[in-house]
Regions:
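Acidic, glycine-rich A-domain
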Residues: 1-178
């Protein structure tokens, strides 16, 4: 169902002449893997979105940092990064000790939310618009708001993804155009 909705979005944007990259991410055995399902130059690459599958954990902050690096090769001046999220960053591998924090810590809860929000702020500081479609538990609403602020839309069912993301994209394009 996620792949179908992602396909609809990617196909619609490409049909409007908007360059589209579709990427998924997960963390497996200590590695955060970004998988490009459809890249900007892929002619009719939207079908590759059907290769999406959910797996592993999600270290959102690191994935966003990687997405920011990938955006540097994008063909447009202005960029919009839209995520489908449950606003519950979580990883099986701990955060390593640093000078400020001498003990390792779990990557979950408030620590994961803070890390993800920091990466969203960093992307926005680079001029990248970041928005999210949130599909998660009521308990995760405060985390979603803390991470994405006003650039957030909530859905309750996956079949609402394409329409909701479409409205979010329209809002973001209006902002980018002004």
């Amino acid at each position: 169902a996620i792949a179908i909705q992602g396909y609809i979005l990617a196909k619609s944007l490409a049909s409007c002449g908007i360059p589209v990259r579709v990427t998924s991410f997960c963390s497996l055995r200590g590695y955060t893997v970004l998988r490009i399902l459809k890249d900007f130059g892929d002619k009719n690459g939207e079908r590759n979105v059907f290769n999406y599958f959910a797996a592993g954990w999600n270290r959102d902050g690191l994935a966003l940092r990687g997405a920011g690096e990938l955006i540097k090769s994008a063909p447009a001046e202005k960029h919009l990064l839209i995520l489908l999220t449950d606003a519950s960053p979580d990883d099986s591998h701990k955060i390593l000790p640093s000078g400020k924090v001498p003990l390792s810590r779990d990557y979950d809860g408030q620590i994961g939310v803070d890390d993800t929000a920091e990466e969203v702020r960093a992307l926005r500081a680079q001029g990248i618009r970041v928005a999210a479609v949130f599909m998660g538990e009521n308990a995760s609403v405060p985390a979603a708001n803390a991470i994405y602020g006003r650039d957030l839309a909530r859905i309750r069912r996956i079949d609402q993804l394409a329409a909701t993301a479409g409205r979010l994209i329209q809002d973001e394009i209006r902002e980018l155009s002004s």
